[in-house]
């Protein structure tokens, strides 16, 4: 359906999806990915709204998945007086992880956040003031805390690239029967080795007695909230494209240029090119080729 010269500006998540990448290359369209656009501080302004929604939703989904009727351990996330709360482990302390932690702490769960960025850990420690444990992420730390968890949230992101498989099938096999995982990273291939994408209609499946919730596009379940949040973030970029054309709009804004993944059959996102061993072309050079 796409043709040469058309602009596709949306979430693409190409790194784990070769068929889509191949079709976009063949289309010769201008393909700009929300999830790799950056701002002047290196943040991901068009991914952030959906990450906030998905992070908060992950705890709602996880709490429901822990119910006995959904195959879970039959735990109330926050416990009650005299009964300990569920142990929630969040792998990744970025926007998704921080929002998941806020929800879990608000429900009085026992929360642990794992991340490899010390500055991120300091910020989270300052925010939660002991209400959530913040741990430097190593293979040993992941194994220890995942095996102790009732609910694990996968919140890992490498911009533009496929998510790393940080929780292995061996870890899953050793988890508590009826424990649950929510893989928010599933749009980028997932960070659990046993993950595969599910739908809102059939959100869960079970591997080794662990309930997996791996719904792609989690924010679609709360479409009204998600739409307003996304519109607020994307509108300034859409206005730039409409008023200036894609060449000028992208070349004037280095962060916007980071969003260019494919143009005229050329791959201009390093992470996507590396995922499929494709030729990478610098985005400025690619635009200049066809000016």
Predicted segments with their positions:
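An N-terminal-biased, well-structured beta-alpha scaffold segment characteristic
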Residues: 1-23
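A short helix->loop->beta-strand "cap" motif at the edges of active sites that frequently abuts
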Residues: 3-7, 27-29, 176-179, 210
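Short, ordered loop/turn segments at secondary-structure junctions
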Residues: 13-14, 29, 36-39, 116-118, ...
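Generic hydrophobic/aromatic pocket-lining and core-packing "Φ" positions
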Residues: 21, 59, 100-101, 121, ...
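Adenosine-phosphate binding glycine-rich loop
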Residues: 35-76, 186, 191-291
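Glycine-rich phosphate/diphosphate-binding loop of Rossmann-like nucleotide-binding domains
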Residues: 69-157, 204
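Rossmann-like adenosine-cofactor binding region
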Residues: 126-209
């Amino acid at each position: 359906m796409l043709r040469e010269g058309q602009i596709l500006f949306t979430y693409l998540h190409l790194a784990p999806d070769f068929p889509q990448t191949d079709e976009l290359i063949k289309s010769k369209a201008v393909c700009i990915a929300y999830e790799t656009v950056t701002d002047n501080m290196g943040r991901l302004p068009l991914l952030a709204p959906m990450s906030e929604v998905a992070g908060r939703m992950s705890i709602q989904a996880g709490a429901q998945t822990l119910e006995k009727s959904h195959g879970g351990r039959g735990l109330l996330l926050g416990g009650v007086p005299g009964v300990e709360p569920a142990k929630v482990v969040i792998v990744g302390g970025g926007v998704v992880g921080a929002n998941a932690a806020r929800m879990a702490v608000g429900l009085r769960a026992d929360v642990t956040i794992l991340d490899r960025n010390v500055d991120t850990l300091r910020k989270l420690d300052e925010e939660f003031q002991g209400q959530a444990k913040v741990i430097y992420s190593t293979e040993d730390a992941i194994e220890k805390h995942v095996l102790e968890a009732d609910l694990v949230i996968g919140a890992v992101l490498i911009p533009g690239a496929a998510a790393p498989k940080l929780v292995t099938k061996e870890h899953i096999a050793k988890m508590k029967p009826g424990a649950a995982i929510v893989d928010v990273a599933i749009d980028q291939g997932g960070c659990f080795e046993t993950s595969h994408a599910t739908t809102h209609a059939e959100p869960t499946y079970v591997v080794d007695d662990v309930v997996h919730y791996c719904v792609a596009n989690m924010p679609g379940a709360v479409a009204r909230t998600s739409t307003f949040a996304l519109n607020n973030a994307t509108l300034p970029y859409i206005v730039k494209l409409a008023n200036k054309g894609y060449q000028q709009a992208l070349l004037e804004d280095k962060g916007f240029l980071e969003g260019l993944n494919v143009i005229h059959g050329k791959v201009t996102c390093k992470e996507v090119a590396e995922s499929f061993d494709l030729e990478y072309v610098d985005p400025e050079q690619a635009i200049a080729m066809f000016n």
